[in-house]
C-alpha cells in the first residue's frame, strides 16, 4: 500500500493510474543510471568548487599551468647555463690574447735593441770603409769620437765635473789672493803721502783749458756756478726732462726737486726747488740766454764751495 501511495504521488495528477505504473517502471532504471553517473561526476566537481571557494577569483583560461611553468623554467636555466659557459670561454680567450699581446710587446721591445746594435755596427763598418776611400769621410770619422767623448762627459761625468769646478775655483782664489796685498801697498802709499803731479787727477776740474798746474789750481779755487730754480714740482720735473734732450752740453748736472723744511716741524716751506750746476760762468750765461723757462718759475744765481 505504501508503494502504491508513493507511486501515485510521483505520477502527475492528469495521467491515469495504469500509465503511471508503466512510466515509473520504465523510468526507474534510467534514474538509477543517472544517479550513479552524477555521483561519479560530483566528486570531480567538488574539489573545483572547494578551490574556487578558497580562492577569491577563479582561474583564468589564459593562465599558465604547472607543466608550462616547469618547461619555461627549464628553458631559462638552460639559457643561463649556456650564457655562463660562453662568458667563461670569452674570459679564457681574453686572457690568452692578453698573454699573447704581452709576449708580442716584449718581443717588440727586445727586437729594436738588436736592430740598433746591428745598425751601429753597420754604420761603424761603413765609416771604416769610407775612411779608407776619401779624406772628407776621414774627417767626419775623426770628429765623431770627440763628440762621443763630449757626450759621455756630459752624461756621466757629474763627480768629475764637480772636481774640475772645485779646481777652477781654487785656481781663481789663488789668482785673486795677491790683489789684497797690492791694495794694502797702495793704501800705505796714500797714507804716507801723494806726489804733487797726482794731486787732482781723480777730481773733475772746473774748466778744461788751463795753463799749467798753478792755473788749474786757481780755476779750481773758484766756486762752481749754480742756478736755483723755484716752482711746482711737476713743472720742474718736466723742465728737467726737456732740457736733458734739447740742451745737451749747456749744463753739467741737474738735481732732483726738493724743498725747505722748518726746524720745529716737518712741513714744507714755500715751493719746491731744483739746482742746475755748470762748469763755468760762461756756460751758465749761455744756458740762461738760450733756455726758455716755463711760466711760474723763478731763477736765482749762486756759487758752491764744493759738490
UniProtKB/Swiss-Prot annotation:
Keywords: Host nucleus. One of its GO terms (cellular component) is host cell nucleus. GO terms for molecular function: DNA binding; DNA-binding transcription factor activity. Residues 20-37, 89-107 have a biased composition (Low complexity). Its main location: host cell. InterPro entries: E2/EBNA1_C_sf, Nucleotide-bd_a/b_plait_sf, Papillomavirus_E2_C. Residues 38-51 have a biased composition (Polar residues). It holds the Pfam family PPV_E2_C. Residues 74-88, 110-141, 152-170 have a biased composition (Basic residues). GO terms for biological process: regulation of DNA replication. Belongs to the papillomaviridae E8^E2C protein family. This is Protein E8^E2C. It comes from Human papillomavirus type 8.
